[in-house]
């Protein structure tokens, strides 16, 4: 997330996490493997049974931060796997035994616990907005660089997001009619209320701050991004 790891190290981290920590039944990526010993002198982590809380549970907050870091470093497919596994587990009531939402952690059976005691939900939303849909602020401008997977588009090849930015309301629509992979497409055209936006290198669209300030506060402004 800090940009410290090299590309080679990131790939090694992904391979290791998949090999040692990923457990679909439990709900995703565990915090650690089973050390098979109790080490109370190392703090509360090793005071729990394996699969509970900080000792090897699928800890939602850390999993979402891992996903965020993967998206930031250009590994959207791997990041999507982290987010989607959490969502699938939470929405499977027979397994999670909880109302729809993101719990603090999932235990060995995939049961969600402590639905209120986590920052994962806010990090999940942050990642969906700023990394998956790719909507960010940059020196006052709005930039949009989507990294959506083909399965995240509807039948018409459309994915939508409603947000507020700089006090204005926006409805953002990403069109990928052929549902190509995120790194196989470029931004062909981008519009805000019918006005053409710049598509920088085909990777991101930009709505400048000076243009945002001209937009009315009451209206929901429509941004359309066409990928090809």
List each model region and its residues.
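His/Glu-based metal-binding/catalytic segments typifying zinc-dependent metallopeptidases
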Residues: 1-8, 13
């Amino acid at each position: 997330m800090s940009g410290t790891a090299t590309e080679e190290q990131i790939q090694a981290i992904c391979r290791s996490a998949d090999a040692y920590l990923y457990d679909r039944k439990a709900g995703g990526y565990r915090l650690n493997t089973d050390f098979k010993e109790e080490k109370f002198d190392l703090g509360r982590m090793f005071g729990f049974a394996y699969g509970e809380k900080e000792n090897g549970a699928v800890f939602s907050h850390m999993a979402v931060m891992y996903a965020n870091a993967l998206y930031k470093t250009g590994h959207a497919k791997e990041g999507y796997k982290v987010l989607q596994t959490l969502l699938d587990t939470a929405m499977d009531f027979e397994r999670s035994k909880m109302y729809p939402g993101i719990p603090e952690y999932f235990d060995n059976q995939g049961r969600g616990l402590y639905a209120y005691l986590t920052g994962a939900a806010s990090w999940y939303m942050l990642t969906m907005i700023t990394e998956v849909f790719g909507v960010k602020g940059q020196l006052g401008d709005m930039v949009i660089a989507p990294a959506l997977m083909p399965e995240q588009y509807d039948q018409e090849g459309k994915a939508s997001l409603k947000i507020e930015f700089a006090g204005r309301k926006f409805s953002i629509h990403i069109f990928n009619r052929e549902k190509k992979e995120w790194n196989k497409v470029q931004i062909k055209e981008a519009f805000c209320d019918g006005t053409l936006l710049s598509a920088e290198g085909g990777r991101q669209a930009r709505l400048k701050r000076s243009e945002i300030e001209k937009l009315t506060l009451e209206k929901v402004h429509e941004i359309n991004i066409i990928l090809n």
